[in-house]
């Protein structure tokens, strides 16, 4: 997911942080990722786009708090908030390619991470603890219909415009990126 490195490198650059601070932030993100991997999923084919961009945003939010000198509790709160905002996002790639609306959803996840980090740093209470949000993320992913989990069978994937794009892409094999 591009949300994690995009948000972290952009924030580190903006704050003019040394590389060591970025590495520490990546470790914080990784710890959140361990919790997600252990109790939910990162695969859009299993949990929709919230499993990919949502997880990336949740990990990035915690890392940004670390970069800005926040507390452990604030990092966890930021991750919880970001994941709460991502629940239920489906995976419906246009033209059966992981390009659109994927890029926009990665941008959304990165901006969500920055916003949630700032909320947590302002001591906004996340209300639902991170572990319960991750459990909910798993449950919601299980409830998302299979047509909305990177199958090219639902959502934007089946619009008339998307089908025209898919047909055009199939006319020139090998020219475009691989499909899901």
Predicted regions and their residues:
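Functionally critical mobile loop/hinge segments
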Residues: 57, 62-180
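Phosphate/pyrophosphate-binding betaalpha-module
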Residues: 1-88
């Amino acid at each position: 997911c591009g949300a994690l490195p995009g948000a972290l490198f952009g924030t580190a650059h903006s704050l003019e942080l040394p590389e060591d601070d970025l590495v520490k932030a990546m470790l914080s993100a990784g710890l959140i990722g361990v919790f997600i991997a252990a109790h939910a999923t990162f695969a859009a084919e299993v949990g929709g786009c919230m499993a990919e961009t949502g997880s990336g945003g949740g990990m990035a939010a915690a890392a940004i708090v670390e970069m800005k000198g926040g507390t452990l509790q604030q990092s966890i709160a930021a991750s919880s908030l970001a994941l709460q905002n991502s629940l239920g996002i489906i995976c419906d790639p246009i033209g059966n390619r992981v390009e659109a609306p994927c890029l926009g959803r990665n941008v959304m996840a990165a901006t969500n991470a920055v916003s949630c980090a700032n909320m947590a740093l302002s001591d906004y209470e996340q209300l639902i603890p991170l572990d319960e949000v991750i459990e909910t993320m798993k449950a919601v992913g299980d409830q998302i219909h299979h047509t909305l989990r990177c199958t090219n069978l639902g959502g934007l994937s089946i619009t008339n415009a998307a089908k025209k794009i898919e047909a055009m892409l199939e006319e020139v094999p090998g020219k475009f990126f691989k499909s899901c």
